[in-house]
């Protein structure tokens, strides 16, 4: 069975090669973010693109209508190529992989932050600086989400590293040490 990275990587790498050739890495990254947010917001669009009974011309027409004026023409051509190769259903994964390649190119890390309450700008700044110190990255992309089960504090995930500074995590560690 083919792993998803074997499906996503060649297309994401090809898109990155075109972007680098044209000096449009960041623009294509913005387009990839637009794809991901649009697909996340529209289940109908996702289902339409995944529908094997629709003709390629119909899918291309929808993509042109939805993204045509918003994305770079080379990116629109790329979308049409994905339709022609029956890979358009993998657009979200390809866009995610492209963004990962862009972060690597720019020496930027992604930090997934869970907190009990929404983070303030000051808290985001502190977390950004701390992650930069820990990773040596030039920049940090913060993806935050609220998890009321944490009670307080934050959990920060960067790659395979996890920093648990939550009240729930502290209580769990105390419980384990008391049980020992």
Swiss-Prot record:
It comes from Synechococcus elongatus (strain ATCC 33912 / PCC 7942 / FACHB-805) (Anacystis nidulans R2). The lineage of its organism: Bacteria, Bacillati, Cyanobacteriota, Cyanophyceae, Synechococcales. NCBIfam families: ATP_synt_delta. GO terms for molecular function: proton-transporting ATP synthase activity, rotational mechanism. It is found in: Cellular thylakoid membrane. The keyword Cytoplasm does not apply. This is ATP synthase subunit delta. F(1)F(0) ATP synthase produces ATP from ADP in the presence of a proton or sodium gradient. F-type ATPases consist of two structural domains, F(1) containing the extramembraneous catalytic core and F(0) containing the membrane proton channel, linked together by a central stalk and a peripheral stalk. During catalysis, ATP synthesis in the catalytic domain of F(1) is coupled via a rotary mechanism of the central stalk subunits to proton translocation. Keywords: ATP synthesis, CF(1), Hydrogen ion transport, Ion transport, Membrane, Thylakoid, Transport. F-type ATPases have 2 components, F(1) - the catalytic core - and F(0) - the membrane proton channel. F(1) has five subunits: alpha(3), beta(3), gamma(1), delta(1), epsilon(1). CF(0) has four main subunits: a(1), b(1), b'(1) and c(10-14). The alpha and beta chains form an alternating ring which encloses part of the gamma chain. F(1) is attached to F(0) by a central stalk formed by the gamma and epsilon chains, while a peripheral stalk is formed by the delta, b and b' chains. Disulfide bonds: none annotated. Belongs to the ATPase delta chain family. SUPFAM superfamilies: N-terminal domain of the delta subunit of the F1F0-ATP synthase. Pfam families: OSCP. GO terms for cellular component: plasma membrane-derived thylakoid membrane; proton-transporting ATP synthase complex.
